[in-house]
Amino acid sequence: MFSEIIRKLPNTDISISVNDKNLFVIECEGSLYKLATMNPSEFPELPQISIENSIQIEQNNLKDMIRKTIFAVSTEENRPIFTGCLFEITNNKLNLVAVDGFRLAWKSKYLQTKVNDFKAVIPGRTLNEINKILVDSFEPIKIGVAKNQALFELENCKIVTRLLDGEFLNYSSVIPETWETRIRVNKSNLQNCFERISLISSSSMEKEKKYPVKISVDIGKVTISCTNQTGDAKEEMF
């Protein structure tokens, strides 16, 4: 409730206080809100974490890596390990990997300083929230990993999350080393085609159902198509 109130208030100064009745008071121009509070001693303290491994990376780089992998995190709770994203340090390179049984997303970035190899699986929900507060700048964020927890530390902000238990997919074994077919297309045109096709593959009339998108490659032409119960669509790129 508090965040929704603040979000909808006008863009001006806000006064926040606690009155003698232990009510949380929010004042802004003609707006006045009083919210019930709880005993602050009941709120859990930030846990003390014995960091075993840590890295530092620019916020804009981490934001880009999360954006390019988080969509492939599974939402199926029967496979909890895949509801997170693998953070893996190998040979001074950070790998972020997500998989949901249909898709695998992998993004890597070499680090500027020498660090030890380690791996941890961070919950996807945590990464979604962290991504909201990361900024597009070279300001650093420090990531520390303990036995069963991780710490994300920015300027004036610390986020602690549990790690997911289990054996993550050996992703390198499922990425082909050779390809039967390789094509080069205009990225912007391909993105526009997929956005239009998605109107058919994700029909608003059938919110719970997704239809497969078919990609056919011929000499000098790529065809993207999809059919659902109400219609079909085809896009061609030359």
Describe every region a protein language model picked out:
Residues 1-238:
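Structural preference for solvent-exposed beta-strand-turn elements
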